[in-house]
Amino acid sequence: MKEQTKEKITLESLGEFGLIKHLTKSIKLKNKSSLKGVGDDAAVLDFGKKKALVTTDILLEGIHFDLTYMPLRHLGYKAAMVNFSDICAMNGTPTQLLITIGVSKRFALEQIEEIYAGIYMACEQYNVDVVGGDTTSSLTGLTLSITCLGEADENKIVYRSGAKVNDLVCVTGDLGAAYMGLQLLEREKMVFQGQKDPEFQPDFAGKEYILERQLKPEARKDIIENLAKAKIVPTAMMDVSDGLSSELLHICNQSGVGCRIYEEKQILEKAQKCTQLPHQPVS
């Protein structure tokens, strides 16, 4: 018996408000600071005695991600996570999220559901409420913009400008894995596009770690929680998204100090020392 292919639902058939209703129908608020979420002209939040933190990131198809190898669910997860990371870098806790998405007619409802599934997965894991957003049509590919709100006690907020002479420079994880994962994906994409064999599959064996660091990064909320338990407030902090040297330059410039880094002291996992690619994690 021939299996029937389920017909995909077009976004045009739903319309903007139908799409929003469909994507947000299962949202339940978890944070006390979320008084009103999706369904009104604006969200209503109450942070009480804490200070509100706000950050936003926009991801453009062809600039920040390539759908040739980026699964849509991973894209949604990563879009949320890069915003959570900014809040954590201020020594805060992410609490609310707003999602703005621009899509073209080439996307079906099921594909948009995959993006939102990734976002909701990230929010569930980090106890963040989706409280609003917007949808629109796009003529230039997929656009995904996330705004994240968080909270922190005023005396525990950590800025880039607080570094002092004789401070110790620390990195919470290893370096270079996400970049090496990107290089591997780009290499395999080129090989795949040059193949005539329809059965050809990219070779990612043994490279799962660096691929996950690129496609499914994690915000270091665990570090913020551990610092709080130890009653430690860093003098300066920021997330490393563009590389160690550029982020240190930001901190040094804003703090009016210099720094010295010892390459042999940096933590590098074996998975990042990939001899198949002409790069080094810290070069």
Residue positions per predicted region:
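Helix-biased detector of long, well-ordered alpha-helical tracts
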Residues: 1-283
